[in-house]
Amino acid sequence: IQLIYQVNVQLGAELEKDLLGRESVICRPAPDTRYRFVTMAESVFPNEAQQRPIVVGFGPCGILSALLLAQMGLRPIVLERGSNVRQRTKDTWGFWRKSQLNTESNVQFGEGGAGTFSDGKLYSQVKDKRHLGRKVLDEFVKAGAPPEILFLSKPHIGTFKLVTMVERMRAEIISLGGEIHFDTKVVRLLQEPFVDSKSNHLDTLTSEGANENIQRQVTGVCLADGTILNSRHIVMAMGHSARDTFSMLLKQGVYIEPKPFSIGFRIEHPQSVIDSARFGKNAGHVMLGAADYKLVHHCANGRSVYSFCMCPGGTVVAATSEEGHVVTNGMSQYSRNERNANSAIVVGINPETDYPGHVLAGIDLQRKLEKLAYELGGSDYSAPAQLVGDFLADEPSTALASAQPSYKPGIKLGDLSEALPEFAIEAIREAILVFDRKIKGFAMPEALLTGVETRTSSPICIKRGPDFQNLSMKGLYPAGEGAGYAGGILSAGIDGIKVAEALAVSLLGSTDSDVV
């Protein structure tokens, strides 16, 4: 095992010139990661001609979007359908312990978004030339995250620390003039025909619904209690499970396309097995912590299987937001010291071949699989599960082995081959055996599979143009994971910043035309 360090040092001009000129020294100038605002409100906002921006959703994307808007002086109004993070935590644990589901306050909905109940991973593969990810991490540290997230290669926070951080970021938004309303659901957009100021052309929406060439102008939102809020600049950061909101947007003419996502199971091994396979004799060393992994396999049937949201020393959690459905996810605390390692093992699917027909067909497939999992689990929110050895042998499981399940409310052993389409079962079986050649013990018969994992990413993309506004609805800014533009806490936060910048420039003009 080799440890790789990067050291950031400040040198005098002569020494810096000398070191940078040596071929034998691996040295380069450190990038300037300081964040620079693209614009700022010069006076109290709004004035008579302007309206405060609205941010729908208060997960990682919505939080960073609202925070940046507030820091630029735009006093955003945040509308979150779920509860504040403390109440939401009580509701979520109540579901895990007593199977009492609150469909508006759970793992998916509420302050902090789905990322609150996760491993809290803070790394991303998105291109980030402007170092917006550093802005996200800086804000997290300011809100109480461990400073080490600024320099570790694979930083993470964990659920308990995220709760306090989210509350502190909320407090800053409010202190800067923003408003945050919980248990507040948007049920309708207000809109008017869009008039192109350059051509004075009036567009109207045809009976066919959303069309990327026909634009409307959003003018506000209607809430579930009938309240009307006016705004011509609305960020939609509602997360990947806001299925009723997706349907509402489509019916109101917002241009949406289906997109690929993945389906599969959670796999659990004793963390000690993964540590030994990855670290050998160094397993358990305090500097290494709990081992993780990242795996991918391209199957004979043309499918790709990969590990997703791997949680070292974590737990498998119940993550449904709809009654009569079972969905799994993974979660870790900062310490990552639970007995099991878990990860989703999922198969990629696409709208052309696996759920054709209409824009929201991917949601229909998700619901079908989640409802089936609920039934296979005994219709009490227990999850269907099977030992890996039995799964590979195509035999139902009847008793647990060394790997004890962490999923609450509980599991029901049986046959998972009924839980997913045949092509997915075939691909996962093949992949597990291949992964065992990379990580010794991955296919151990005693390991446990729990189903189903269906919410790896949003099944739709709310299309937007270079100005970050929806192609058919001016003033509507689709953002984050739910809109199809992010996957994880860090990338969602980055997208929230980008959208906030575009919105602010649209309202106020830019101080730097190169940054948006």
PLM segments and residue spans:
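Residues forming the flavin
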Residues: 1-117, 121-196, 200-516
